[in-house]
Regions:
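Short, intrinsically disordered, charge-balanced linker/junction segments flanking boundaries
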Residues: 1-4, 265-271
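Gram-negative/organellar outer-membrane beta-barrel architecture
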Residues: 1-132, 198-199, 205-211
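C-terminal outer-membrane beta-barrel translocator/porin domains of Gram-negative envelope proteins
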Residues: 92-247, 251-269
């Protein structure tokens, strides 16, 4: 609901359940807190997985209040406080690294963060032209079980050409995760999912622990990485068919990598 109680507030609640995962999400946003341009919001979520693309179960509970303040027509600043509790349980055939992380039990992370967004894209004929830049960091260590820093950067550009019939886009993303106390877990580290890097199965890129070098049988744990970068290039074009068919074509090229682990052993590959 984008106009909750007729006051311009946004309220969202979603439920997703399946054979191997469960997700509950609740969010609220007040765009005119104290009758000024300061926005106040809150996110609350619970996510469980039951051996989803892995040999163990996970639970993730998150509570995040935040404020958003405009910095002109194109830029805005978001500041948030996050409390996240994660748990790994019910392991099957897993390696030493995941076993150690399961034995840690429930871990609570308490952090404060910011995200700075500058969006110069112009809405034109239903498309967007221009440039988008996002920079964000999360500083963990406010009473939780670990202390560290997570940095994310994204830059995107879109451009229409040939009488606005062809759209070119480029997106580059990067992330760095560092800890000064405690260690990262598989629930913290980066994975290049299909919305970041197309063409690979879940967990198909980056460090993994295998009981044999071919990763064919036995242990085969996707561990994720503490660093990642990816570049996505895409062009969309019409097929020359009538518009009412709603069909268009596209080509894309993605290149990226996820790497780096603070804890490795002889069975870890691609770190």
């Amino acid at each position: 609901e984008k106009n909750f109680l007729g006051r311009g507030q946004a309220l969202s609640f979603s439920i997703r359940t399946g054979a191997d995962d469960r997700l509950y999400e609740l969010s609220f946003f007040e765009p005119m807190f104290l009758r000024n341009d300061l926005g106040l919001g809150m996110n609350l979520s619970l996510k469980d997985t039951n051996k989803q693309n892995a040999a163990y179960d996970t639970e993730n509970v998150m509570f995040q209040p935040f404020i958003i303040y405009p910095l002109g027509q194109k830029a805005k600043l978001k500041v948030d406080y996050s409390v996240i509790q994660t748990d790994l349980s019910n392991p099957g055939l897993v390696g030493a690294i995941v076993t150690d992380e399961v034995n840690e039990g429930k871990i609570t992370s308490s952090s404060i963060g910011y995200e700075l967004t500058n969006d110069s894209r112009l809405y034109k004929s239903g498309q967007k032209n221009g440039f988008l830049l996002k920079v964000g960091q999360q500083f963990a260590g406010l009473g939780g079980d670990n202390t560290g820093l997570k940095t994310l950067i994204m830059a995107a550009a879109q451009r229409e050409a040939f009488k606005e019939e062809v759209k070119f886009s480029a997106v580059v993303e990067a992330g760095v995760l560092t800890y000064t106390s405690g260690n990262s877990r598989v629930t913290d580290r980066f994975f290049l999912s299909s919305n970041k890097m197309r063409g690979f199965e879940p967990g198909g890129l980056g460090p993994r622990e295998c009981s044999n070098k071919l990763c064919g049988t036995g242990t085969n744990d996707a561990l994720g990485g503490e660093n990642f970068t990816v570049l996505r290039l895409e062009a969309e074009f019409p097929f020359g068919l009538p518009e009412e068919y709603g069909l268009s074509g596209g080509i894309f090229y993605d290149i990226g990598n996820v790497w780096s682990l603070s804890k490795v052993n002889d069975n870890v590959l691609y770190e």
